[in-house]
Amino acid sequence: MVDQPDSENLDHAVDALSKRYDPLGTECRWQKIWEEEGAFHPDPNDEGEPFSVVIPPPNVTGSLHMGHAFNTALIDTIVRFQRLQGKNVLCLPGTDHASIAVQTILEKQLKKEGLTRDELGRSAFLERAWAWKSESGGRIVEQLRRLGYSVDWKRERFTMDTRLSKAVSEAFVRLHQQGLIYRGEYLVNWCPASSSAVSDLEVETKEVDGYLWHFQYPLSKINDSNGIRFLEVATTRPETMLGDVAVAVNPSDSRYSNIVGQTLTLPFLGREIPVIADDHVDMDFGTGCVKVTPAHDPNDFAIGQRHNLRQITVMNKDGTMNAEAGPFEGLDRFEARKAVVKALEQKGLLTKVEPYRHSVPFSDRGKVPIEPLLSTQWFVRMEPMAERCRSHLGKDEPRFYPDRWAKVYRDWLTGIRDWCISRQLWWGHRIPAWFVVSETNNELTDDTPYIVALSEKDALLEAQKKYGTDAVLRQDEDVLDTWFSSGLWPFSTLGWPDKTNADLSRWYPTNTLVTGFDIIFFWVARMTMMAGAFTGKMPFADVYIHGLVRDEQNRKMSKSAGNGIDPLLLIDRYGTDALRFALVKEVAGAGQDIRIDYDRAKDTSATVEAARNFANKLWNATRFALINLGDTTFKETFDELEHNRLELSDQWILSKLSKVNNETAKRYKKYALGEAAKGLYEFAWNDFCDWYLELIKRRLNLGESPSEADLSNRKKSQIVMFKVLRELLVMMHPLMPHLTEELWHGVTGFSNKKLLALQSWPALDKDLIDEDLELSFSELFGAIRLVRNLRAEAGLKPSQRAPVRFVTKNQNLLNLLKKATQDIQALTRANKVEILHPREIFEESSGRSLAGVSGELEVLLPIEGLVDLQALRNRLQKDLSKAENELSILSKRLDNPSFVQKAPEKVIEECRLKLSDAEAQAELVRQRLLGLK
């Protein structure tokens, strides 16, 4: 049963809905009401199937950008729809502590004060970090609130909350107990700017124009070497030659077979290094000789492991050269590069320098070249965890939308390297490991034993058991990679590891993850691996992957490109709902990038403005409905109406309503959100506003003495209009929540305390769908559009009435047109409407007419006596000459063999399309002229 409007408050509702839609005031009001009413604060004991989403936590350092706005619009559309489906929905928000980003900001502040973090001390530094987080970290949250996120702010989480920090320690300890976390020496990506290791995924590879330096190493002894006195190597990083421990050649390379096993003398240091044979070497590249620096190159590290070579680190962690660099000690790595090249040249060992474009890894945060550095770090063994995820993926867990991303995810899980999780920072989750030292010796070595425990108290008890009561503990200085805690996000936020937590029991696993393709491994894979290890389940059923927000030139938005758009500027100008709707409607398909235009000089966007205009359209349509419901007391409901006794236009809009209900629900469920938005837009703007409301105006606006039949028809149209508008607002709510909530309370009466956000999705009545009727009305609307075009061509003024004739062989269409004669007359400003079969058209002349065809309908607009026929003929003759001239030019171009052979296919195709359009236009004008004879 359809709710009835509160008739006593309808007049007030019209007054309450101002003539102009004020998005900012409306949004502010409803966001406050939703929060005060606890609309999005579910109880785990509430009825309804559970549905949960944890939002990707933005960094506390961040400000709202278009990526956030896009992600928010998609997530909120999904969760609001599920709420309307009667689900017990939890959408949980939170923020990430962003170790490197926050620490970088704070260290820049300290630098301005003439301090370093070491001078300030760890405790004071962390006090500053928490103070900064309290003052600035809430900015992104307040900005997210402006987007109308229907999240449970009472359950807001922060990755360094006490509960979440305990979960991080628990996860670390468990993985260590399972042998999946270990401490070892390995080459890591070192960022000298932040003095920290960074993961492979925090490295951005850039193409750089540099040089390839060729130089020689002399053989230590000239024995049986086929006259070879030197071996030539080449590198883009000559400063690393100071750490060389060998030169490798391919074992199949006959040029060097006699000198494998001999030694070379390393310039400047005098160190003797062996010539070794290794299959890794490409004998066809350069001279076929490769310098081996295990402590500064991943490939060389592997060679060193195979040949048991020494590992010599020649750089400090700040990027300067250490004592192993001999005469170059103390130089910055790039200064050392210049100095080494110059010294090689002076010794006559530099043979060639050539320009060389190559890939250089940069720190994503520090923005400086990464230095592969040998370091003792904490690692997670990834392969056992990845294998569990691959097994789940075989069972379609999780499902990816679109499904092509499942392969990308699987590829990431295949051949995976161990994950370096320690970071040389202070802001973050400190590693729960304590080194066992003594009161007299607090220094750490590679052999210093350590204890991994949940707390220092637990660690001390274990240390005393193992090493005696005089054991002294020193906690590891490092913190965990931010992605470690983010990997626990879907279940740590719900109370894990407390298995008795009601939220965890009710809402885990979660239902949907919405995220960008760029962090499938950064975050998605790590969440699935962590969840598999700790819960035995995948953390979400579905993963909806969206694309990027690009500008009108299809460029990725970024600070460096200077083409980013501040969403708050667009929100201030057009409103949150307009921005949200524009973003979702632009999605052509799941995973596709979207484009948003922006005029920087005017702070305007045509795309978002169009969405704002749509909001205005809905606002005005609702005001129209309220004005025409204001004197109504509904004594009957829609369910009591006899469908077959409704006007055909009522039956048509109800068919369209049922169809859009069915299609929209399916699209929302399948994450076809862009298609859902487009379908609702077409229904609301075209079907409901432009056609149905225009069709029923005649029935709503009764004369002074209406008949009982007129009053009955008016009541029916009011009931149908109310039903359609009410259900449209419910279906539109996930996309434009503030606007629809305001209009809902206008339609149902402002005394209605029930929030639209908590209503039920409209029941679907497929029996109302009538495909034949919809097809007939489509023909009718096409004919009406044609009449309007013919009137415009004839130059008729809006006030001028003219007869119109419709001719068709289709009997069903004839019947519809005859029943809709009064509506046609009103919509075409006709003083007379004739509906004829072709055999009837010859019974009397229609005089000089403009004619056209729309589908199965021929339309005649008799205009003799209404316009200057000669002037109209002259204008049409000019149009014909123009079209024929265009035809001639295009035909000659396409008949030219040279053009067809040399022009790009795209240009030729455009020319053919223009020719087709010109032919159609010429034929149309000829028909118009024929009707005027």
From Swiss-Prot:
<dbReference type="GO" id="GO:0004832">
    <property type="term" value="F:valine-tRNA ligase activity"/>
</dbReference>
<feature type="coiled-coil region">
    <location>
        <begin position="864"/>
        <end position="933"/>
    </location>
</feature>
<feature type="short sequence motif" description="'KMSKS' region">
    <location>
        <begin position="556"/>
        <end position="560"/>
    </location>
</feature>
<dbReference type="InterPro" id="IPR014729">
    <property type="entry name" value="Rossmann-like_a/b/a_fold"/>
</dbReference>
<keyword id="KW-0175">Coiled coil</keyword>
<feature type="short sequence motif" description="'HIGH' region">
    <location>
        <begin position="58"/>
        <end position="68"/>
    </location>
</feature>
<feature type="binding site">
    <location>
        <position position="559"/>
    </location>
    <ligand>
        <name>ATP</name>
    </ligand>
</feature>
<dbReference type="InterPro" id="IPR019499">
    <property type="entry name" value="Val-tRNA_synth_tRNA-bd"/>
</dbReference>
<dbReference type="Pfam" id="PF10458">
    <property type="entry name" value="Val_tRNA-synt_C"/>
</dbReference>
<dbReference type="InterPro" id="IPR009008">
    <property type="entry name" value="Val/Leu/Ile-tRNA-synth_edit"/>
</dbReference>
<dbReference type="InterPro" id="IPR037118">
    <property type="entry name" value="Val-tRNA_synth_C_sf"/>
</dbReference>
<dbReference type="InterPro" id="IPR013155">
    <property type="entry name" value="M/V/L/I-tRNA-synth_anticd-bd"/>
</dbReference>
<keyword id="KW-0030">Aminoacyl-tRNA synthetase</keyword>
<dbReference type="Pfam" id="PF08264">
    <property type="entry name" value="Anticodon_1"/>
</dbReference>
<dbReference type="GO" id="GO:0005829">
    <property type="term" value="C:cytosol"/>
</dbReference>
<dbReference type="InterPro" id="IPR010978">
    <property type="entry name" value="tRNA-bd_arm"/>
</dbReference>
<comment type="subunit">
    <text>Monomer.</text>
</comment>
<keyword id="KW-0067">ATP-binding</keyword>
<dbReference type="Pfam" id="PF00133">
    <property type="entry name" value="tRNA-synt_1"/>
</dbReference>
<comment type="similarity">
    <text>Belongs to the class-I aminoacyl-tRNA synthetase family. ValS type 1 subfamily.</text>
</comment>
<dbReference type="InterPro" id="IPR033705">
    <property type="entry name" value="Anticodon_Ia_Val"/>
</dbReference>
<keyword id="KW-0436">Ligase</keyword>
<dbReference type="GO" id="GO:0002161">
    <property type="term" value="F:aminoacyl-tRNA deacylase activity"/>
</dbReference>
<keyword id="KW-0648">Protein biosynthesis</keyword>
<dbReference type="InterPro" id="IPR001412">
    <property type="entry name" value="aa-tRNA-synth_I_CS"/>
</dbReference>
<dbReference type="GO" id="GO:0005524">
    <property type="term" value="F:ATP binding"/>
</dbReference>
<dbReference type="InterPro" id="IPR009080">
    <property type="entry name" value="tRNAsynth_Ia_anticodon-bd"/>
</dbReference>
<dbReference type="GO" id="GO:0006438">
    <property type="term" value="P:valyl-tRNA aminoacylation"/>
</dbReference>
<dbReference type="InterPro" id="IPR002303">
    <property type="entry name" value="Valyl-tRNA_ligase"/>
</dbReference>
<protein>
    <recommendedName>
        <fullName>Valine--tRNA ligase</fullName>
        <ecNumber>6.1.1.9</ecNumber>
    </recommendedName>
</protein>
<feature type="coiled-coil region">
    <location>
        <begin position="807"/>
        <end position="833"/>
    </location>
</feature>
<keyword id="KW-0963">Cytoplasm</keyword>
<keyword id="KW-0547">Nucleotide-binding</keyword>
<dbReference type="InterPro" id="IPR002300">
    <property type="entry name" value="aa-tRNA-synth_Ia"/>
</dbReference>
<comment type="function">
    <text>Catalyzes the attachment of valine to tRNA(Val). As ValRS can inadvertently accommodate and process structurally similar amino acids such as threonine, to avoid such errors, it has a 'posttransfer' editing activity that hydrolyzes mischarged Thr-tRNA(Val) in a tRNA-dependent manner.</text>
</comment>
